[in-house]
Amino acid sequence: MINIGLSGSTGKMGRAIAERIDEFENCKISAKFSSTNSLYDLDNFCKHSDVFIDFSTPEILETLVNYALKHNTKLVIGTTGLQPKHFKLLEKAAQTLPILYSANMSIGANLLSYLAKEAIKILDDYDVEILDIHHRNKKDSPSGTAIMLAETIANGKDLDIIFNRGNRPRKKEEIGISSLRGGNVHSIHEISFLDDNEIITLKHEALNNNSFANGAIKAAIWLQDKPSALYSMQDIYKIY
């Protein structure tokens, strides 16, 4: 039996994971951490968990990582809005622990990332724009997924990622991200490749949180026999 701790248990993703855990054999929720708990509770929670899934806030990450290192608890990190210091923390901890980080745990979004990486090889002279749409209550903008997609496309192309152009025209050597927040939209990401004659658009839309929850649980199971390293969902789905 795999004991899975859950950080951010009262949020949308935490609830979705708890609701779907019974669909996976030999898995159970061993601990639930939320904003009502003390950070010190993470010590005991990590002690009794084989792996911790984190969908909380960036402020909790350092404490969670420290207790995970203390108890050799594997980590699946889905919290977005992380800063460079957080990624450095994960990279260092991954020398000791198997850790999987992804801004989006669904197979669809990761397939979109792969398709975009392949498309830019052919459409390398096209303008690239990303549209990121989420519900009105999402805090980070642009989304972690939008940044992941932009970084995938920009990798090796020497392209700047732009969130706000202000009053200037578009430059050729950039990828623009536009964010919309409103209603109860779960998640929509569109990547458009544009030239003077045509527009090619790749799109992923999540209709609910189930695909993210399924991906997170699969990641927790997948990590069990893996050596220490920092992994992504593309390692699970084998789409590079």
Curated annotation (Swiss-Prot):
GO molecular function annotation: 4-hydroxy-tetrahydrodipicolinate reductase; NAD binding; NADP binding; oxidoreductase activity, acting on CH or CH2 groups, NAD or NADP as acceptor
Subcellular location: Cytoplasm
Gene Ontology CC annotations of this record: cytosol
Known catalytic reactions: (S)-2,3,4,5-tetrahydrodipicolinate + NAD(+) + H2O = (2S,4S)-4-hydroxy-2,3,4,5-tetrahydrodipicolinate + NADH + H(+); (S)-2,3,4,5-tetrahydrodipicolinate + NADP(+) + H2O = (2S,4S)-4-hydroxy-2,3,4,5-tetrahydrodipicolinate + NADPH + H(+)
Residues annotated as binding NAD(+): 8-13, 78-80, 102-105
PROSITE patterns: DAPB
UniProt keyword Transcription, yes or no: no
Signal sequence annotation: none
Any Pfam family matching the protein: DapB_C
InterPro entries associated with the record: DapB_C, DapB_N, DapB_N_CS, DHDPR_bac, NAD(P)-bd_dom_sf
Pathway assigned in UniProt: Amino-acid biosynthesis; L-lysine biosynthesis via DAP pathway; (S)-tetrahydrodipicolinate from L-aspartate: step 4/4
UniProt EC number: 1.17.1.8
Highest taxon of source: Bacteria
Active-site residues, as the UniProt record annotates them: 134, 138
Positions of (S)-2,3,4,5-tetrahydrodipicolinate binding: 135, 144-145
GO BP, one annotated term: lysine biosynthetic process via diaminopimelate
Keyword vocabulary terms for this entry: Amino-acid biosynthesis, Cytoplasm, Diaminopimelate biosynthesis, Lysine biosynthesis, NAD, NADP, Oxidoreductase
Family statement: Belongs to the DapB family.
Entry function: Catalyzes the conversion of 4-hydroxy-tetrahydrodipicolinate (HTPA) to tetrahydrodipicolinate.
Protein name: 4-hydroxy-tetrahydrodipicolinate reductase
Originating species: Rickettsia canadensis (strain McKiel)
Gene (name only): dapB
